């Protein structure tokens, strides 16, 4: 099962496949479609950190 992570602000239209990375745990989506949704949502929120 390939997991996709939300794209970064630089490239919203793209969602990357998640590789093994112990450093940071980003939001991971099980399907590319979900990742795309995540991308769009993130682009809207922009920099809104708690």
Curated annotation (Swiss-Prot):
Listed GO CC annotations: nucleosome; nucleus
Disulphide-bonded residues: none
Matching InterPro entries: Protamine_P1
Keyword set, alphabetical order: Chromosome, Developmental protein, Differentiation, Disulfide bond, DNA condensation, DNA-binding, Nucleosome core, Nucleus, Spermatogenesis
Gene Ontology terms, MF aspect: DNA binding
Domain of life per record: Eukaryota
Biological role stated in the UniProt entry: Protamines substitute for histones in the chromatin of sperm during the haploid phase of spermatogenesis. They compact sperm DNA into a highly condensed, stable and inactive complex.
Family under the similarity heading: Belongs to the protamine P1 family.
Name of this protein: Sperm protamine P1
Organism annotation: Pan paniscus (Pygmy chimpanzee)
Underlying gene: PRM1
């Amino acid at each position: 099962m390939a997991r996709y992570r939300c794209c970064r602000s630089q490239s919203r239209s793209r969602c990357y496949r998640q590789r093994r990375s112990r450093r940071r745990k980003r939001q991971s989506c099980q399907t590319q479609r979900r990742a795309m949704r995540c991308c769009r949502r993130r682009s809207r929120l922009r920099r809104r950190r708690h």
